[in-house]
Amino acid sequence: MIQFTFRQIDYFVATAEHGNVSAAARARHVAQPAMSMAIGQLETLLGEKLFHRRAGHGLTLTPAGRILLDQARALLSLATQMSSAAIPPAGPLKGRLTLGCFKDLAPYILPRLLAGFRKLHPDAIVDLFEGDFTAVRESLVGGRSELAVTYELGIEADIKRWVLAELPPYALLPATHPLARRRSVSLAALAKEKLILEDMAQSREYFMSLFWAHGHQPRVSQYTQTFEMQRGLVAHGAGVALSCTRPAGDRSYDGVAIACRPITEKLAPQRVVLAQLDAARQSPLAAAFVAFAREK
């Protein structure tokens, strides 16, 4: 039987996630030579090279390394779960957690969650990473973020998730638009207007698919980089829009009213999820955040 240690496995995972030994050593608060020695010992025990080493280019996983990475993450996750089950943490936790979040949802959902979590764990530090669907997913898969809050359409089926909320699509209209006088607005009516979309692939495809599924081809007049710019353009009469994220106030940043109306057609809501890699190690702090978020 191969006699490796959990420390060697942990150092291997850290190096794979950071792409170089120096950064991995800093993250684990150990000396670089100790990190290099542990990885070398693991390669010797396994009889396989786990990394390609090229001067000035960092480290990349070999085929054997890529296979081992999934297994190593699963092994460390199991060890953490066993440890947590044997000695459940009591009282407030300390430590650091990196939380990714889809940028449109971040101001809508995170402040409330973080405020409540801070009351339970005042000494815990939660670092935030905000980005579009792709950036948040990559931060999760690459190990930068241990958890991520995003719409379900932004993640693959093999990523573990917990549903936090379900938000139905709705229409954004200029407050003075004739359609704003209706209690609900059909996709057919919206398809005749100038449509403003956020310039993100998953978002574009999702909202366009709602029209296509009902036999409509909308006219996209403009793309924006942010949700608030989209809302601002709608408020000032540049077009109409669809969204699932619904701020409490129906006004643009510069104070102009926006009319928000439900869609007449029955459309499935978008799920807001808290996501984590299936094979990722879940720290006690991450487990506490998951438990707290699921209760809210």
What feature does the model see in each segment?
Residues 13-31:
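Short helix-boundary/capping micro-motifs
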Residues 94-156, 217, 224:
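Central regulatory/effector-binding core of bacterial HTH transcription factors
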Residues 57, 63, 87-106, 120-124, ...:
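Interdomain hinge and pocket-entrance segments immediately C-terminal to HTH DNA-binding domains
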Residues 45-46, 68-90, 152:
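Alpha-helical linker/hinge and terminal dimerization helices associated
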Residues 157-168, 182, 189, 228-278:
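Beta-alpha-beta core module
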Residues 12, 24-25, 62-65, 117:
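Hydrophobic two-helix hairpin corresponding to the core of helix-turn-helix DNA-binding domains
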Residues 193-214, 245, 249, 282-291:
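Secondary-structure junction motif
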Residues 43-63:
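A short LG(V/I)-centered, amphipathic sequence patch enriched
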